[in-house]
Design a protein with these regions (language model features):
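Active-site nucleophile and cofactor-binding loops and adjacent substrate-binding regions
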Residues: 103-114, 132-141, 232-235, 261-266, ...
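Alpha-helix C-terminal capping segments
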Residues: 119-129, 143-155, 176-177, 274-284, ...
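Active-site-proximal loop->helix
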Residues: 141-204, 300-310, 421-429
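Claisen-condensing/thiolase-fold acyl-transfer catalytic domains that form or cleave C-C bonds
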Residues: 264-272, 364-430
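Positively charged, low-complexity intrinsically disordered leader regions
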Residues: 2-129
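A short, small-residue-rich loop immediately preceding and capping a beta-strand
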Residues: 116, 124-163, 256-269, 290, ...
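Active-site/ligand-binding loops adjacent to catalytic centers
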Residues: 66, 196-234, 242, 254, ...
């Protein structure tokens, strides 16, 4: 029987996260304090994040950052996650390509987001923080943060983008099961939310708006810090457990990827799967292609500008050097709520600028077609966000079929779609074009 899954034991969970900034040929430009226009300091960021995350955010020298023992113990509840050979998908496509996926959907909340939520909640508890706030789109990050906060004895408040709050009611229920206070954004509970609703009463929400509300609440609440699930360097750092495991598992499979693909919203799962492999491109040892698959309706990488911009709509965050559509950009109401963000993380933006990362945009219909194909071939219903990575992998595999090329493709299945079936209903009914 052909080997389908490549598994690592719990003692193979990485001991350290990989900090790609230490190896980048060109370092990212600094984030700026919006008041002084000077590079932000750990002290600046510590007003927003816990201090350890602020230090990790600005660390451009240490290649390896040790994972605390207690976080590794929590990782062991679901890590190491499987690397899977997608024989069924290969057969369905009639491609000579070998397709692998790293299955992050097996985590307790169904996605990769827990990898950083556990780390951020742990550091907050260690520093005496009692409350955390965050934003969430589809609810994957909100669910992860709610779960992690409960584990580490913190109170969590989550602002969920209104359209996703309405489209995905069971994610709200999951967050509430873990004890979080969940509020649709924009709301009347913050100045940022009130300002937006005054201008646009029917505003359906965006991640940029939800970030503004979460940041504002954190600033107003004693003993509270803001946490987030993507974009920032420390978040992507925590996600590198994905690629570090995948590197060992690909070795077990006796192959090395020619192309690695991740869906792209802010960059956390994309960086998580690609960065550990990318260091070998920096040295010239490998020539792997890295493809970021973003929604065509929110094309910050393929159509955005590289410039300084705020990470949120109200302008509460530092100024970030990134590919952006503008912090006031209002994305359309696609079902991949976790990808509806106007900008890209600073590290990925620099890597795009320097030619190490390619970007493709995927129409919503194509993403769901690929998601259904994958589900029928592999038995896993993917999250709408993950469907974008699958669609990009399908494109690559079809090129291999046309050229009769045998290539090895790896993508990150960032989450399952079992709480997203209303979106699939819309697709199956022919309502997604």
């Amino acid at each position: 029987m052909k080997q389908k899954k490549f598994m690592l034991s719990e003692d193979m969970i990485p001991n350290s996260w990989y900090n790609i900034q230490a190896d980048m040929p060109v370092k990212p430009m600094p984030m700026l304090n919006p008041q002084t226009k000077e590079p932000v300091t750990v002290a600046d960021l510590s007003q927003l994040f816990c201090e350890e995350c602020a230090r990790q955010e600005l660390n451009q020298t240490d290649r390896w950052i040790e994972i605390p023992d207690e976080v590794r113990e929590r990782y062991a509840n679901y890590r190491c996650t499987p690397l899977v050979r997608a024989y069924g998908l290969e057969e369905a496509l009639g491609t000579p390509a070998h397709i692998y996926f790293k299955n992050e959907s097996v985590s307790p909340i169904g996605s990769h987001k827990l990898n950083s939520a556990l780390a951020q909640a742990y550091y907050c508890r260690q520093e005496g923080v009692t409350n955390v706030t965050t934003e969430t789109g589809a609810g994957q990050w909100g669910a992860a943060l709610s779960y992690a906060a409960k584990i580490f004895g913190l109170e969590a408040a989550v602002y969920q983008v209104k359209i996703s709050y309405e489209q995905k009611p069971y994610r709200k229920s999951i967050m509430q099961v873990f004890g979080a206070l969940v509020t649709p954004s924009p709301s009347m509970s913050t100045r940022a939310g009130k300002d937006i609703l005054t201008k646009m009463p029917n505003h359906q929400g965006s991640l940029g708006t939800a970030i503004s509300e979460a940041v504002e609440l954190a600033r107003m609440t004693p003993g509270c810090k803001y946490t987030l699930g993507s974009v920032m360097n420390h978040v992507t750092l925590h996600q590198t457990v994905i690629g570090l495991e995948a590197e060992k598992q690909m070795e077990m499979a006796g192959e090395y990827p020619d192309v690695i693909i991740g869906c792209f919203g802010g960059g956390s799962n994309f960086g998580g799967i690609t960065f550990p492999f990318m260091r070998h491109n920096f040295t010239g040892e490998r020539k792997t292609r890295f493809v970021a698959a973003e929604p065509a309706s929110c094309p910050k990488l393929t159509q955005g500008k590289f410039e300084y911009d705020f990470g949120d709509e109200a302008g509460y965050t530092p100024l970030l050097p990134m590919y952006t559509l503008g912090h006031d950009f209002q994305p359309s109401n696609i079902h991949a709520g976790g990808l509806r963000y106007h900008g890209a993380g600073t590290v990925v933006s620099q890597l795009i600028k320097d030619g190490y990362v390619e970007a493709v945009d995927i129409e919503q219909k194509e993403s769901f077609e690929a998601g259904c194909l994958f589900a029928r071939a592999e038995g896993i219903i993917p999250a709408p966000e993950s469907c974008h990575a699958i669609a990009a992998a399908v494109r690559e595999a079809e090129k291999c079929r046309e050229k009769n090329e045998k290539k090895t493709i790896l993508f990150c299945l960032s989450g399952h779609g079992l709480i997203d079936m209303a979106a699939y209903d819309q697709f199956l009914a022919g309502n997604i074009h």
